[in-house]
């Protein structure tokens, strides 16, 4: 049967979607294996966090979902350390920070009384932010101390209900630290702080002045006075200091601390466990970029890239600075670091590059990505790691999709043909990327072959690989065919709106999909139901056009969805932020590409 959630933690009878349980162990994509492991661990964690101890009311749903998300990483790290699951947590934290940088975000602890308001609480804040804050607290207290506090909390409230206050009290009592003062600043108020770092040498030490304020993507709000304050456990390390971070508690608007050694840079989120953004001086960004690969851990490199991108988003840095840092990490072969960079390079290419500069940007990307592809190779090697397999598929896709590299696109058509003729002959990582790349210039014959695979798939993974290749077709007739197919009885209702949303989030399908939704709204709602319709509302946040924003505003003002009211506000804000970012950075990017992209074109 169709199942709206991925899984459900019923005591003694956990239920799952088939795709979260059934996988070809030999061929299955590593990313799907990780997702399956994560969901299973999440639901098992709910047996304690949610079932044994249950929140008193829905306003504390994060006690269930945040704890289960935090806990789900633990058994996977112990079972498969080679998957580097902690790095995926850091990437996920970056996505959560994006949502929490919107003015329309909410506090973790949020009042809710109606069914629609309650449904809205099951979001990235309840899961992602709550888990990130718990990881920060665990790092601040130490694993053993934090675990002792969790045990005390569970023992005191087992087979009963609890609140956030109950948890803070248990941790404060166990740790003898002011947890009950620190955590409410992250749980009871919305948003995220940015900690600005300024350093100056004083003999053989470095004075580090930290200043905190709330971070907004909205530039006017970010620059306006704001009286919010957090009590922030912050860990730092300097270029001249020890490997072990210096951890302090920032409780005021501005405080100065001293680190050993005279450093030319100070990393403001050492270990990458802090839930905050960091703002650096321009000269420190350059110094950090130079030393990043040698002196920062992969997690710290990801957090640094996230912080620099945030500074670009609010105009503190030109987009060229981010590209320069990415270029400086050109020899980095850590799967998670590269994955994080490629996500932003895709965003830049889709939203910030003008049509006149597209060829230059793609040429720069080919120059950047080709050495990576050469290193990982087109085919797997005996004994290679799961990280290497994942990296190959990710770089392959970026080279074909973002850079439109002719060799990658030719290889994609070849691999797709092999996978369609004999699915067992190709790894699912490469097959999924190849299907999507082949679809870009694909015709009706390829479309029909993918439909046949959807109907005759021997595993849920094969089914979804083919299904979610369909939104990549750029032929207008095939785009329309996918939209009609999505709301037909041939597609399961649990998948229908995600398929429509994926078409809507592709450059070629954006306008046709939105027009389709406007013309077929009653059918879309019938297929997805009132709660699932929020999938479409959230999908509009990928638009970057004032006219389409106005259409979204008019339509969802007339067709309100109670369970997606905040999602709607966030989508409008994301559109506005993108429009503003494009207006601020497009010319700067053109200038940067004039110097770097043109040189790449000439090679």
Question: Which residues make up each language-model segment?
Answer:
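Hydrophobic alpha-helical and helix-loop surface patches within well-folded domains
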Residues: 1-214, 218-223, 340, 344-347, ...
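Domain-wide signal for the mature, well-folded portions of proteins, strongly enriched
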Residues: 18-19, 52, 96-100, 105-111, ...
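Short, glycine-/Ser/Thr-/acidic-enriched flexible segments
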Residues: 21, 75, 202, 213-216, ...
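A short, hydrophobic secondary-structure junction motif
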Residues: 39-40, 231-241, 373, 442
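Amphipathic repeat-derived elements
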Residues: 41, 45-50, 174, 233-238, ...
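Long, ordered, helix-rich scaffold segments
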Residues: 93-94, 211, 224, 245-247, ...
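Short, glycine- and charge-enriched coil/turn segments that flank and shape catalytic ligand pockets
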Residues: 173-177, 201-205, 242, 293-295, ...
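Beta-strand-rich binding/interaction modules
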Residues: 179-180, 190-269
């Amino acid at each position: 049967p169709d199942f709206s959630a991925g899984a459900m933690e019923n005591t003694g009878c956990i239920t799952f979607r088939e795709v979260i349980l059934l996988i070809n162990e030999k061929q299955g994509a590593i990313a799907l294996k990780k997702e399956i492991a994560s969901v299973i661990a999440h639901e098992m964690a709910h047996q304690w966090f949610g079932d044994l101890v249950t929140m008193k009311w829905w306003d504390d749903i994060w006690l269930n979902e945040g704890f289960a998300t935090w806990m789900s990483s633990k058994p996977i790290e112990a079972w498969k350390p080679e998957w580097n699951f902690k790095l995926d947590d850091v990437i996920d934290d970056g996505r959560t920070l994006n949502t929490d940088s919107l003015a329309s975000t909410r506090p973790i602890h949020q009042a809710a009384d109606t069914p629609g308001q309650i449904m809205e609480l099951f979001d990235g804040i309840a899961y992602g932010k709550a888990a990130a804050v718990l990881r920060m607290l665990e790092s601040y207290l130490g694993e053993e101390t934090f675990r002792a506090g969790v045990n005390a909390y569970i023992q005191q409230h087992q087979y009963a209900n609890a609140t956030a206050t109950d948890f803070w009290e248990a941790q404060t009592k166990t740790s003898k630290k002011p947890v009950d003062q620190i955590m409410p600043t992250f749980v009871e108020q919305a948003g995220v702080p940015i900690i600005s770092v300024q350093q100056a040498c004083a003999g053989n030490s470095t004075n580090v002045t930290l200043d905190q304020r709330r971070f907004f993507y909205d530039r006017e709000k970010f620059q306006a006075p704001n009286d919010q304050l957090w009590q922030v456990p912050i860990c730092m390390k300097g270029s001249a200091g020890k490997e072990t971070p210096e951890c302090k508690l920032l409780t005021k608007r501005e405080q100065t601390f001293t680190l050993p050694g005279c450093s030319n840079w100070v990393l403001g989120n050492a270990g990458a466990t802090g839930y905050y953004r960091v703002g650096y001086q321009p000269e420190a960004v350059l110094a950090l970029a130079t030393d990043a690969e040698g002196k920062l851990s992969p997690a710290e490199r990801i957090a640094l890239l996230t912080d620099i991108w945030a500074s670009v988003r609010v105009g503190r840095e030109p987009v060229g600075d981010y590209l320069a840092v990415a270029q400086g990490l050109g020899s980095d072969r850590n799967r998670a670091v590269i994955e994080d960079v490629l996500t932003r390079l895709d965003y830049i290419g889709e939203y910030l590059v003008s049509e006149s500069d597209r060829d230059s940007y793609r040429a720069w990307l080919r120059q950047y990505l080709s050495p990576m592809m050469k290193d990982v190779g087109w085919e797997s090697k005996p004994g290679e790691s799961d990280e290497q397999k994942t990296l190959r598929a990710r770089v392959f896709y970026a080279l074909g999709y973002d850079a439109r590299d002719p060799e990658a696109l030719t290889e994609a058509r070849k691999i797709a043909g092999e996978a369609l003729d004999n699915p067992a002959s190709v790894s699912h990582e490469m097959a999924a990327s190849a299907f999507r790349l082949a679809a870009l210039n694909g015709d009706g014959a390829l479309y029909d072959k993918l439909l046949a695979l959807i109907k005759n798939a021997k595993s849920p993974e094969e089914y979804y690989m083919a299904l979610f290749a369909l939104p990549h077709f750029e032929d207008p007739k095939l785009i329309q065919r996918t939209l009609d197919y999505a709301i037909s009885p041939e597609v399961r209702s649990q998948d229908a709106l995600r398929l429509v949303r994926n078409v809507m989030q592709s450059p070629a399908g954006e306008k046709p999909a939105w027009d389709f939704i406007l013309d077929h709204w009653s059918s879309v709602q019938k297929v997805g139901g009132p709660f699932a319709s929020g999938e479409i509302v959230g999908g509009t946040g990928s638009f970057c056009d004032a006219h389409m924003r106005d259409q979204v505003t008019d339509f969802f003002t007339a067709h309100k969805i109670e369970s997606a009211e905040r999602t709607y506000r966030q989508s409008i804000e994301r559109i506005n932020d993108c429009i503003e970012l494009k207006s601020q950075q497009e010319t700067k990017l053109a200038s940067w590409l004039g110097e770097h992209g043109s040189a790449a074109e000439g090679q």
